[in-house]
Amino acid sequence: MSIGILGKKLGMSQFFDEKGRSIPVTLVEAGPCRITQLKSSATDGYSAVQIAFGAVREKLINKPFQGHLAKSGDDLLRYMSEYRVKDVGEFQLGAQITVGDFEEGQKVDVSGTSMGRGFSGYQKRHGFSRGPMSHGSKNHREPGSTGAGTTPGRIYPGKRMAGRYGGKKITTRGLMIMKVDSDKNLLVIKGSLPGKPGSLLNIRPAKCVGLNSSKGGNK
């Protein structure tokens, strides 16, 4: 039963199906993750499984975090995430979560941080059309009108303008797992995923109704 897993984006490639069609895929080094805490309704108010991923040097994490990790194992790990479950009795503290918990053909939701592009203008950030480039025009890449004049006398909140572009949490939903390689801890997922190579990804079974119905639904 798959509840979710943390992984590192490796990059994009292509996958050929049985008909010889080329399918763009993303390679993800997922897990192994260690269960670091089991939360129950009696002690925490809800049931959840907390996992950790990514080896790290001792000096890069503080003492309280080291003490928390020591309850489930000796390895020091950097990233954490938790997943709601109905019954934590099915899980064991210190157990491993691996790509073997997922199946080929399963649909997943993948969350990550999109590529940061810094302070960007109107055309790049929102896809605005540019102004005329000739006939004396000086309005090449300007925004144009941003609203009325004296009334309301201000720019309404939410107006699409230049600003910081990217670097936000993005979730891509309903992606299919094309291949599972347990020996190399690899997931081959159809399509593109958020972030640049090396960035952290959170992979969990898709929540959309009916996507995984053939495999018994989400648990």
Curated annotation (Swiss-Prot):
Q: Which GO terms describe its molecular function?
A: rRNA binding; structural constituent of ribosome
Function noted in UniProt: One of the primary rRNA binding proteins, it binds directly near the 3'-end of the 23S rRNA, where it nucleates assembly of the 50S subunit.
Q: What is this protein called?
A: Large ribosomal subunit protein uL3
Give the family per the record.
Answer: Belongs to the universal ribosomal protein uL3 family.
Enumerate the InterPro entries for this protein.
Ribosomal_uL3 (IPR000597), Ribosomal_uL3_bac/org-type (IPR019927), Ribosomal_uL3_CS (IPR019926), Transl_B-barrel_sf (IPR009000)
The annotated region (Disordered) lies at 125-164
| Gene source species | Prochlorococcus marinus (strain SARG / CCMP1375 / SS120)
Keyword annotations for this protein? Ribonucleoprotein, Ribosomal protein, RNA-binding, rRNA-binding
List the GO terms this entry assigns under cellular component, sorted alphabetically. cytosolic large ribosomal subunit
Query: Which SUPFAM superfamilies does the UniProt entry name for this protein?
Result: Translation proteins
This protein's assembly is summarised as: Part of the 50S ribosomal subunit. Forms a cluster with proteins L14 and L19.
Q: Which Pfam families match?
A: Ribosomal_L3
Keyword Metal-binding recorded: no
Please list the GO biological process terms of this entry.
Answer: translation
Record PROSITE patterns: RIBOSOMAL_L3
Superkingdom assignment = Bacteria
Q: Does the keyword Transmembrane apply?
A: no
